[in-house]
Amino acid sequence: MKVGVGIHIIADFYGVDSKLISTTERMYPIIEGAVKYGRLTKISSDYYQFRPQGASGVVLLAESHLSFHTWPEYGLVTLDIYTCGDPKTADDAFEYLTRELKPTSVTTRKIVRGDLVGEEGLNEMQVEIH
C-alpha cells in the first residue's frame, strides 16, 4: 500500500499588490499567520530584505518548512510549503496565504513525498542519483 510521508506544495502567485510584498515588515505577519492557521509548529524563522525591494523568508517547522521569495516589480510571490503528517495542514496554510495575498492568478504543484513507503521490495530497491 502506498502512503506518503508528506505533502509539498509549490506555488507561484501572480498579480499580488507590490506594496504588500515589497518588505519583510509586510510579509512577516502574513507568513507567521499561515503557520498559525495551518496549526504548524514553528521552530525558528529568518527573513531577508532585498534593496531596493523584495523579501525572502523561511520558517523551519517541526513538520518541515515554509519558504517564500517576492518580486514586487512583477507582483510575484513564489512559495514552498512542505509538511509531514496531516496533509490538511499544508492545504490550510496555502488557503490562508491565498486569502491574504489575493493573487489574480496562481500556479501550483502538489507532490506527495515519500510515496514509495510501504511498497513491496522498497528495502531492496537501489536508486541511482545523477
From Swiss-Prot:
Site (Cleavage (non-hydrolytic)): 63-64
Record EC number: 4.1.1.50
Residue numbers annotated as active site: 64, 69, 84
InterPro entries: AdoMetDC_fam_prok (IPR003826), S-AdoMet_deCO2ase_core (IPR016067), S-AdoMet_deCOase_pro-enz (IPR017716)
Cofactor binding, note field: Binds 1 pyruvoyl group covalently per subunit.
GO BP, one annotated term: spermidine biosynthetic process
Assigned GO CC terms: cytosol
Pathway: Amine and polyamine biosynthesis; S-adenosylmethioninamine biosynthesis; S-adenosylmethioninamine from S-adenosyl-L-methionine: step 1/1
Any one Gene Ontology molecular-function term assigned to this protein's record: adenosylmethionine decarboxylase activity
PTM remark: Is synthesized initially as an inactive proenzyme. Formation of the active enzyme involves a self-maturation process in which the active site pyruvoyl group is generated from an internal serine residue via an autocatalytic post-translational modification. Two non-identical subunits are generated from the proenzyme in this reaction, and the pyruvate is formed at the N-terminus of the alpha chain, which is derived from the carboxyl end of the proenzyme.
Residues found modified as Pyruvic acid (Ser): 64
Protein family: Belongs to the prokaryotic AdoMetDC family. Type 1 subfamily.
Protein's job: Catalyzes the decarboxylation of S-adenosylmethionine to S-adenosylmethioninamine (dcAdoMet), the propylamine donor required for the synthesis of the polyamines spermine and spermidine from the diamine putrescine.
Listed NCBIfam families: SAM_DCase_Bsu (TIGR03330)
Name by which UniProt lists this protein: S-adenosylmethionine decarboxylase proenzyme
Biological source species: Thermoplasma volcanium (strain ATCC 51530 / DSM 4299 / JCM 9571 / NBRC 15438 / GSS1)
Gene: speH
